[in-house]
From Swiss-Prot:
It holds the Pfam family EF-hand_7. It comes from the Eukaryota. GO terms for molecular function: calcium ion binding. Signal peptide: none annotated. It comes from Homo sapiens (Human). The keyword Repeat applies. Keywords: Acetylation, Calcium, Metal-binding, Repeat. Disulfide bonds: none annotated. GO terms for cellular component: cytoplasm. Has some calmodulin-like activity with respect to enzyme activation and growth regulation. Binds two calcium ions. Ca(2+) 1 binds at D52, D54, S56, Y58, E63. This is Oncomodulin-1.
Length: 109
């Protein structure tokens, strides 16, 4: 699966442009601009599986660091503060990782 199978390349490019500089990544803005927030719960879970590098069923901080690169290979890494903020926004049960349900809830919040 390619991310452009489910999201428009133009929308992805626009979303990445908005957070090009370090410490400018805002999850909800990214989800809206990329079109992710308009997708069904099942489609969001498909994107989650694409982002889940090790197919563990969870996203940890290391995977989140490379979140933008899953949308475009040349994109920047998230900063440590952006990574921690993204984790805090989605990790509802406080276990230090984001499951598919938590990810879907964050995207649609």
């Amino acid at each position: 699966m390619s991310i452009t199978d489910v999201l428009s390349a133009d929308d992805i490019a626009a979303a990445l442009q908005e957070c090009r500089d370090p410490d400018t990544f805002e999850p909800q803005k990214f989800f809206q601009t990329s079109g992710l927030s308009k997708m069904s719960a099942n489609q969001v879970k498909d994107v989650f599986r694409f982002i889940d590098n090790d197919q563990s069923g969870y996203l940890d901080e290391e995977e989140l660091k490379f979140f933008l690169q899953k949308f475009e290979s040349g994109a920047r890494e998230l900063t440590e503060s952006e990574t921690k903020s993204l984790m805090a926004a989605a990790d509802n049960d406080g276990d230090g990782k984001i499951g598919a349900e938590e990810f879907q809830e964050m995207v649609h919040s």
